[in-house]
A protein has these predicted regions:
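Beta-strand/loop substructures that line and gate deep hydrophobic ligand-binding cavities in soluble
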Residues: 91-142
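Charge-dense, helix-prone N-terminal extensions
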Residues: 2-5, 11-13, 53, 58, ...
Length: 156
């Protein structure tokens, strides 16, 4: 079930705020983000693959994800976990390793809340250097959440 997408651009910071309700328990959604083998099944926009994921899921632990677009070269994103609160929340820095001049490190918060037998997923990310970078991430996260939903709901 798709609950909708909300986008927020604060006056001082460019951020994104996305929400989705998935018809599965919160523990299943958290597991999909916490386990590299699961993450590889849905991470990235439609058509992307994640052939390599290094994941040290603890506060201060690092991660590195290789992303492969359908018709392009492999690229990487990496960061550090700032908060690990199973099965409620993950917060981590997010940095492209070969950044565009308009890229900078952002912070992602992936929050999960019970909604009856479903789970409300909230993704917040920011602050972005430009509106164009924020818009790219809104598109990327929207497709990524679509893939997460397809994976999890297909199991039910």
């Amino acid at each position: 079930m798709r609950a909708g997408v909300t986008m927020t651009a604060a006056s001082e910071e460019l951020t994104l705020h996305l929400q989705r309700v998935l018809a599965v328990p919160r523990s299943r959604v958290f597991h999909a983000h916490a386990e590299p083998d699961e993450l590889a099944k849905w991470w990235g926009p439609k058509g992307f693959t994640s052939p390599s994921i290094e994941y040290d899921l603890r506060v201060g632990g690092r991660y590195r994800i290789a992303m492969q677009p359908p018709d392009g070269d492999l690229f990487y994103l990496s960061g550090e976990f700032r908060e690990v609160d199973p099965p409620r929340r993950l917060a981590y820095t997010f940095r492209w390793e070969d950044p565009d001049p308009d890229d900078r490190e952002t912070v992602v918060t992936f929050s999960l809340r019970d909604r009856g037998e479903s789970t409300e997923v909230t993704v917040d990310q920011g602050a972005f250097a430009t509106e164009a970078r924020r818009a790219l991430h809104v598109d990327g996260w929207t497709e990524t959440l679509d893939r997460l939903e397809e994976l999890i709901v297909s199991e039910v």
